[in-house]
Structures are given as C-alpha cells and as structure tokens.
Design a protein with these regions (language model features):
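One-carbon transfer enzymes
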Residues: 1-208
Length: 208
C-alpha cells in the first residue's frame, strides 16, 4: 500500500477528490495516512476528520524563525512515514531538505498548463486572472513532481480545459477544478501507487 500524506492550506477540494477516489476505488493500493495544514482554520482539516484521517496544523506563525518551523514541519511529515506527499493547494514553501529527502516523492497540482502561468506569484485565482487577461482560449491543470524551483519539476499529467465567452476568474477556476484538477490528481496518485511512473533525466514515463 502506498502511504500518502496530503499538505493543504485551504478548503481542501482537491483533498476531497483524493478521499473520494480512494473510497470509490478510483485510486487503488493507497492509504491516506495524514493531512497537515499551515492554517488551523482550513476546512481541509474538517474534511480529513470526517473520514477518520489524522489531521494537524503546523504553522510558520507559531515559530520565531523559519528554520524552527522547517525542523518541526519536517519532523511531523517524517512521523507519517509517507511514500508520497501530495501538495493539494499548499501555500508554504517546502524546505529544501524535505525536497532532497523525498526526491520524486512529492507531487503538486497547479491550475495551469505548465509552463504557462506558473512560477512565483501564480497561485489560486491569480492564475485564472492572468489567463483571462492574456486572452488564451485553452487553460488546464498540471500534476508534477516537486523540485527546488517553483512549478519546475517533471510533469506527470496535464489536462486541457476550454475558456468560454464571458468567463470570470471564479467561473474558470471552478471549471478547471471540476474538469481537470479533480481528475488528474487522483489519476496520478493511482499511477504512482501501482508503480507505473518513472522519472529519468527530468522526464516522466508512464507504463501502460
């Protein structure tokens, strides 16, 4: 069984998609071993509790220095003994020590077709605002492994979503979630859980 820990900062809609997929068998060979948030008010913690998944908050605000936070945060992650760490809307910079320790074992969902609208400053609604301002006709989502850069790790899965006339950032965000994020994130976890994903020279191969 693949032991999966999920890190999340907000409402946890992607977390819910993962939970649902594990429970309905879309994700196989997987156990959700814990949820960690940097926000004690994150509804994601409630979602986890509703499904008897251990959940806790570790916030940078509770520590005098970022080094102290990084140390405790990494300890809490290590305690879960995860085989895979999923960033599902986690708005805290991951310590580099954690990235090196869990090389190619951390994945992130980003609400654009990387390399478009990604990197520093592109998160949440800002991605969709930028896409509409540029006038693109197709947007989407990307699941990728996490490296030391911002949204620069090897790409696992992508799914495109059409922009429709009259879209607002909020409407587009919801469509990207429903048509892309909530589908490819569970799919990526299932592929990894079943040993179908390999990384070589910065590129992902998926066994059929």
């Amino acid at each position: 069984m693949l032991r999966v820990a999920v890190l999340v900062s907000g409402g946890g809609t992607n977390l819910q998609a993962i939970i649902d997929a594990v429970e309905n068998g879309t994700i196989t060979n997987t156990e959700l071993v814990g949820v960690i948030s940097n926000n004690k008010n994150a509804y994601a913690l409630t979602r986890a509790g509703n499904h008897q998944i251990p959940a806790q908050c570790v916030s940078p605000k509770d520590f005098e220095t970022r080094e102290e936070f990084n140390k405790v945060f990494l300890e809490k992650v290590d305690e879960l003994k995860p085989d895979l760490i999923v960033l599902a809307g986690f708005l805290v910079v991951i310590p580099e020590e954690m990235i090196s320790r869990y090389r190619n074992k951390i994945i992130n969902i980003h609400p654009s077709l990387i390399p478009l609208f990604c990197g520093t400053g592109y998160y949440g609604l800002k991605v969709h605002e930028a896409a509409l301002a540029r006038g693109v006709k197709v947007v989407g989502a990307t699941v990728h492994f996490v490296d030391e850069g911002t949204d620069t790790g090897p790409i696992i899965l992508q799914k495109a979503v059409e922009v429709e006339e009259g879209d607002t950032p909020e409407v587009l965000q919801r469509r990207v979630m429903e048509q892309a994020e909530w589908k490819i994130l569970p799919h990526a976890i299932d592929l990894i859980a079943n040993g179908k994903v390999t990384v070589k020279d910065g590129r992902v191969s998926i066994a059929r």
